Amino acid sequence: MLEFEQGFNHLATLKVIGVGGGGNNAVNRMIDHGMNNVEFIAINTDGQALNLSKAESKIQIGEKLTRGLGAGANPEIGKKAAEESREQIEDAIQGADMVFVTSGMGGGTGTGAAPVVAKIAKEMGALTVGVVTRPFSFEGRKRQTQAAAGVEAMKAAVDTLIVIPNDRLLDIVDKSTPMMEAFKEADNVLRQGVQGISDLIAVSGEVNLDFADVKTIMSNQGSALMGIGVSSGENRAVEAAKKAISSPLLETSIVGAQGVLMNITGGESLSLFEAQEAADIVQDAADEDVNMIFGTVINPELQDEIVVTVIATGFDDKPTSHGRKSGSTGFGTSVNTSSNATSKDESFTSNSSNAQATDSVSERTHTTKEDDIPSFIRNREERRSRRTRR
């Protein structure tokens, strides 16, 4: 029997913690963009760098160990600094239902302290999601090795982990794109992930999703993919769904996902057929036995636009490969899906990129002439063929 909850639901408390220089920078850019219903926390061993943070809560960790002078690119010092300041970290996390821990892997503070912070958050009962970057190849083997160890430590500490190799930034931006603008693309994975989840649990829908649904999909699931796609006009539902599951910045593909939370937001013209079209695209790209939780929201302000939000987990954790100049930006497409407006002017990819959005899905799994056919279409045809044979 289906049961429907009525009445007021307490909104989940979301906190974003930036650890180290890279994490602090990501938090600053999120704050500059403007986000509601989220608390920001900056953690660093470097007191001078911490003073530049725009977060409302700042924690200088390891004051006795480092005297505020940083971790010297030594992850062990970063780890010990976080352990020294455990009580301060616990106080900052207190009351959070969901915690995003973001950092750049390869240095000292982020690599060493972020797993400690994430472990504390999870031990305190918060749904804990890590969003980390791997260093560029040109940063050297030592930094790459430290980053790999940091990623493994994060995997052990969080519920789900999203990894962004910085080298992928070279695949999605033009040669003339300024460095800081390129880094914003990586930050979009975090920003739009937080925004998407915040909107899912804050906005009531015709078919409603809540924080319990988010926990079902993301608790203890390893790697994760989060995507947002927006489209309008003809085939808008299909195009939005394709964009949402195509993330060339991420190490994880939706192919084989065993858990998917999907939400479709549209104007009053959103039809049941369009909802089915979008759901079919996502379901056919995932595992055959996927556990899919589906919701819809009607927002008259969107008019002709449809926004598809996808959270996918339950993978085999095999890194994916991507071709250059693949479709959309890191978190599906660069859109703000708040209930007030949808912004489409943040993408740094070319105008033709949307037409290529599904290529990255097929590139991850096939190297034959069938590469021109998106894998979710092949999967759908194979399933239909099996049903016919039965």
From Swiss-Prot:
Result, substituting I373P: Does not affect interaction with FtsA and FtsZ
Effect of R380A: Does not affect interaction with FtsA and FtsZ
UniProt superkingdom: Bacteria
Residues the entry annotates as binding GTP: G21, G22, G23, N24, N25, G108, T109, G110, E139, R143, D187
Gene Ontology terms describing biological process: division septum assembly; FtsZ-dependent cytokinesis; protein polymerization
SMART domains, A to Z: Tubulin, Tubulin_C
Feature: compositional bias, Basic and acidic residues: 361-384
Membrane-spanning parts: none
Location of this chain's protein in the cell: Cytoplasm
PROSITE patterns from the UniProt entry: FTSZ_1 (PS01134), FTSZ_2 (PS01135)
Subunit comment: Homodimer. Polymerizes to form a dynamic ring structure in a strictly GTP-dependent manner. Interacts directly with several other division proteins. Interacts with FtsA.
Record-linked PANTHER family: CELL DIVISION PROTEIN FTSZ-RELATED, MITOCHONDRIAL DIVISION PROTEIN FSZA
Function: Essential cell division protein that forms a contractile ring structure (Z ring) at the future cell division site. The regulation of the ring assembly controls the timing and the location of cell division. One of the functions of the FtsZ ring is to recruit other cell division proteins to the septum to produce a new cell wall between the dividing cells. Binds GTP and shows GTPase activity.
Protein name per its UniProtKB record: Cell division protein FtsZ
Gene expressing this chain: ftsZ
